[in-house]
Amino acid sequence: MTTRFLQISLACLLASSLAGAGALAKDRKLETTDTMIPSGDAGIQLFVRNKHPAGKPTSPDKILVFVHGATYPAETAFDLPIEGVSMMDLIAARGYDVYLVDVRGYGRSTRPAEMSQPPEANKPIVSTAVAAHDLGAAVDYILGKRKVSKIDVMGWSWGTSIAGLYTSEHNDKVNRLVLYAPQWIRREPPAPAAANAAPLGAYRLVSKDSAKARWLKDVPADKQADLIPPGVFEAWADATWATDPEAGKHNPPMLRATNGVVEDSLNYWSAGKALYDPGKITVPTLLLHAEWDADLPSYLAQGYFAQLKNTPYKRLIELSEGTHTVMMEKNRMQFFRELMGFLDEEKPLALK
């Protein structure tokens, strides 16, 4: 376990973005701790990062854990400094005890043995159910460490299915649920596979160029130039590909990403079936989405929202001029404002 301290100045940044809400963050010294925790499966450890205001007691209703999507780890997006501060920094500076976790196969977490073999040598690995198990290990670690019974849970993209599945089975451990770009049943059928296509392997290889093209796919041409702050894509890509020790063995460098999520998408979301039942979620839930999300279009978030039939309350926010990765774009403070508006509000009496 490693711990370090970071002095960040957030007053001006937050004052300009949150002045309308009358909020102003003071300078905060954040304590950062990196830990490897057991997954509960032999030989598999999970990377967990924690940030919170140094020297401040933990508030039981201000603890949040974030889980990533299908291709990239949590650390290099949620904790990527943009203009000096990351989304994780911003939330922690508001007095939150913030965690991120990488499920097995991603970031600094253990890569299953199949990832050291050619992808075609094994079937897809790390299903959504396995990833939800890993999220559960992180939640239990945090509950034990902070001696609380519930925490806030946030997932992005595939992480919404990880977090949603987990919450549907463990409502008693979740205070609030945030789903950023949720997966749901697709209208369009999957692209037909070629007759000679190879079976889906254990993992796939992803290049930086393909990541950039995917990021900007549905952004109008005249809006692309200033969508991503200068240097952010390069900083994110360099940090992300550096998490894979085998990326440099390819030219160009290639990031390994597990294919369990792809198999689940083919067998469920693209086959007209739900992977789990959102109707089993019984905690306050926020859905965040951006209008130019090419990976998971708006109708998916709307369809998912309709299935949240047993939450005490629910909210769907559509952000303008943003993509699947709005959290790292020019309108990231819109994202932050809506997120904190949900997390900061007091519980209804019925939930106390």
Predicted ranges, named:
Residues 26-58:
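N-terminal cap/lid segment of alpha/beta-hydrolase-fold proteins
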Residues 55-100:
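Short, surface-exposed "cap/lid" segments of acyl-processing enzymes
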Residues 74-75, 101-123, 324-325:
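Glycine-rich "HGGG/HGxG" loop immediately N-terminal to the catalytic nucleophile
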Residues 119-145:
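Alpha/beta-hydrolase active-site loop
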Residues 146-188:
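Conserved hydrolase catalytic core segment
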Residues 188-286:
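Alpha/beta-hydrolase
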Residues 294-300:
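Conserved alpha/beta-hydrolase "acid-adjacent" motif
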Residues 322-333:
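Catalytic histidine-centered segment of alpha/beta-hydrolase-like enzymes
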